Amino acid sequence: DPYEIATEDQVTLETLIEGIPASLVQAGSEGYASEGQAWDFALPAIHIATESMTGDVAIGGNIGYDWFAQWGTNEALGADYAVGALTWDNYYAWIMAANNVIKQIDASDFATLDATQKSYLGFAYAYRAMFYLDLVRLYEFKENNYTEAPGVLGLGVPIVLPETTEAEAKNNPRAKVDDIYDQVIFPDLDKAEELLSGFTAPDKY
């Protein structure tokens, strides 16, 4: 379909970076909205889903009326269910998008970049830091009074970087939470702060 796929020569740095916030609010981001799954709308849906797991949202328990009751009642969230993949599928697609921007810009010396390149690269690092921060908070097992999982204590999620090969991605175990912070989140935020220090958002008004 020529309206759904961009050719390589149509993809620019601008379209790559602008595609990230657009994808965060995409209806049908997992492909289930067309099958009647009303919870399939990217980051806003993830926010509602996680909020439904707290005590601040009243859950009716009938998924025929409340599309987020599955998160509130902790049902059908395993690996065999589409709802369980809402966060995983979306976040790693967004991480890939950020990695694609980072891969396109030579980040070895920020001083050689023009203002546009600095802003695009800064956005990509900031987005990627946010995505990994969210994933770590979602998937890190915390000690509690109800379940035990000593085998995954201290583990977060797999780290995928621009240089990660397909073969490496297929055998990419969960990284330690500390490593995700030290190798990705904190460095990405430091780079974003440096790259965006001179950035001023345009005034639409």
Each PLM stretch: what is its role?
Residues 4-7, 11, 40, 139-153, ...:
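Short, surface-exposed recognition loops and adjoining beta-strand edges that mediate ligand/DNA contacts
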